[in-house]
């Protein structure tokens, strides 16, 4: 079915920053996608094009990316008459129009918007849900479909919050639930208990939420944060059913080959900065003491030695985000160096759907897990909810059970679970190997 029109406009993300929305029109209707953006972005990511004109949107405008869709991609796309059901052909066309390794000519935000909108249009042309079309594209098994464990970011530190806490995300994972719906109820109850405990211990303003919906109290150490979460799990009556995941985002506090856990203090004491092995010892002690099942970005994005050293003895899922940035070359290196055993999949890091699917397939082939992820600057777009089901990864992180741009994805997963009924299973404790269920 022919695409009659491709059109982009600038809209706003959850931080109030401009982002790209793309509409693709076929006989079946108008199909829309909005591109997210990150705060802690890896240096090896595809280029998100921003205008840089400080007099408008403080330099964060996306008028050039929008113009690239409307003036370069749209005419070429309509003229090429590409079969939108063939995602590889769609993305190959987009990549050939750009011609750079990191999508810096047109912008990954321009390319991805079109790539996702095309997948939505193709699903409609086939008269199937988006998750089914994505399963077809990735040759995923669909009996049963797998609903993911939601890793809910309930407490924020690092670059996402004030306070001295260095680690960026503390997530709860309701692995003991029997269904996604029950996982959400458990997550919601723990979240509300955490909020009231936080206000009690740190004052009412501590209940205010960060970019991803988690509380951001003035906490100094990881232990203090974890004690608070464990207490909230107990108070909610869900002990044993809820595990914990960390996203350390440690590239953010890596300085001169060391890790500065007091990085938000401009006068931090350099004699207290930690070496890779010292930081690994800290993680080991946390894993011993708390029900942690997953640690993301424990070390900086090019500190390969620290990653490989820690992975040997970690005993929990080690997730690569800044290390791999959903980039097939970086993923291959991480697999070869035995640096991690799970990929954080962010579609806008690589900038097209086909490349995202390939990244997941490469990871599965190496026996890795895959956690599909939102970005901190999100929108009401729910694409990744269908993606996590289509790829059967068994795990997703898309913020707290609060703020509509986070809940949009979680609510879409509730709908998908309901629609699939007994054709789907909840990953639960098998989140790391969801694709094998």
Curated annotation (Swiss-Prot):
Q: Where does Mg(2+) bind?
A: 247, 296, 321
Query: Which Gene3D superfamilies would you find in this protein's record?
Result: Enolase-like C-terminal domain, Enolase-like, N-terminal domain
Q: Which reaction does it catalyse?
A: (2R)-2-phosphoglycerate = phosphoenolpyruvate + H2O
- The positions annotated for binding substrate are 160, 169, 296, 321, 373-376, 397
Q: Residues in the active site? A: 212, 346
Instruction: State the InterPro entries in the record.
Output: Enolase, Enolase-like_C_sf, Enolase-like_N, Enolase_C, Enolase_CS, Enolase_N
The biological processes this protein is annotated with in GO are: glycolytic process; regulation of vacuole fusion, non-autophagic
Record localization: Cytoplasm
Pathway entry:
Carbohydrate degradation; glycolysis; pyruvate from D-glyceraldehyde 3-phosphate: step 4/5
Which EC number applies? 4.2.1.11
The UniProt keywords, alphabetically, are: Cytoplasm, Glycolysis, Lyase, Magnesium, Metal-binding
What does the UniProt cofactor note say? Mg(2+) is required for catalysis and for stabilizing the dimer.
Q: Give the primary localization class.
A: cytoplasm
Xref: SMART domains: Enolase_C, Enolase_N
The Gene Ontology CC terms held by the record are: cell surface; cytosol; extracellular region; fungal-type vacuole; mitochondrion; phosphopyruvate hydratase complex
What's the cofactor? Mg(2+)
Q: Which PROSITE patterns match?
A: ENOLASE (PS00164)
Report the GO molecular function annotations.
magnesium ion binding; melatonin binding; phosphopyruvate hydratase activity
Under NCBIfam families, the record lists: eno
Q: Which family does it belong to?
A: Belongs to the enolase family.
Question: What is the protein's quaternary organization?
Answer: Homodimer.
Output the PANTHER family linked to this UniProt entry: ENOLASE
Protein name per the record: Enolase 2
Look up and give the organism this protein is from.
Candida glabrata (strain ATCC 2001 / BCRC 20586 / JCM 3761 / NBRC 0622 / NRRL Y-65 / CBS 138)
Recall the taxonomic lineage recorded for the source organism: Eukaryota, Fungi, Dikarya, Ascomycota, Saccharomycotina
| Encoding gene, per UniProt annotation | ENO2
């Amino acid at each position: 079915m022919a695409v009659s029109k491709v059109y982009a406009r600038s809209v706003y993300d959850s931080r109030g920053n401009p982002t790209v929305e793309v509409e693709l029109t076929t006989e079946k209707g108008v199909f829309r996608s909005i591109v997210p953006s990150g705060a802690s972005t890896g240096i090896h990511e595809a280029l998100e094009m921003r205008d840089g004109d400080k007099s408008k949107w403080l330099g964060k405008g996306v008028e050039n990316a929008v113009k690239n869709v409307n003036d370069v991609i749209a005419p070429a796309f309509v003229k090429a008459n590409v079969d939108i059901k063939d995602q590889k052909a769609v993305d190959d066309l987009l990549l050939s129009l750009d011609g750079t390794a990191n999508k810096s000519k047109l912008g990954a935000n321009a390319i991805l918007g079109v790539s996702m909108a095309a997948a939505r249009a193709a699903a409609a042309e086939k008269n199937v849900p988006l998750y089914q079309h994505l399963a077809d594209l990735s040759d995923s098994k669909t009996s049963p479909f797998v609903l993911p464990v939601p890793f809910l970011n309930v407490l924020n530190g690092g670059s996402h919050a004030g306070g001295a806490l260095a680690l960026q995300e503390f997530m709860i994972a309701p692995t003991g639930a029997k269904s996604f719906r029950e996982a959400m109820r458990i997550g919601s109850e723990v979240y509300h208990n955490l909020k009231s405990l936080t206000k009690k211990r740190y004052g009412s303003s501590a209940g205010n939420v960060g970019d991803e919906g988690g509380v951001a109290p003035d906490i100094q150490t990881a232990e203090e944060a974890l004690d608070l979460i464990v207490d909230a799990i107990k108070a909610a009556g869900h002990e044993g059913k809820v595990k914990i995941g960390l996203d350390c985002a440690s590239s953010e506090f890596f300085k001169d080959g060391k890790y500065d856990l007091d990085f938000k203090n401009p006068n931090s004491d350099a004699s207290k900065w930690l070496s890779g092995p010292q930081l690994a010892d800290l993680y080991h002690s946390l894993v011993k003491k708390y029900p942690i099942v997953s640690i993301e970005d424990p070390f900086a994005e090019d500190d390969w030695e620290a990653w490989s050293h820690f992975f040997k003895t970690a005993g929990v899922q080690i997730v690569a985000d800044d290390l791999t940035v959903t980039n097939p070359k970086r993923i291959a290196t991480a697999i070869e160096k035995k640096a991690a055993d799970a990929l954080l999949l962010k579609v806008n890091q690589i900038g097209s759907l086909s490349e995202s699917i390939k990244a997941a397939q490469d990871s599965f082939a190496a026996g890795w897990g895959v956690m599909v992820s939102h970005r901190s600057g999100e929108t009401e777009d729910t694409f990744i909810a269908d993606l996590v089901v289509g790829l059967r990864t068994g795990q997703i992180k898309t913020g707290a059970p609060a703020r509509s741009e986070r809940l949009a994805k979680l609510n879409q997963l509730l709908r998908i679970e309901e629609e699939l009924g007994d054709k789907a299973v909840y990953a639960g404790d098998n989140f790391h190997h969801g694709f094998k269920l």
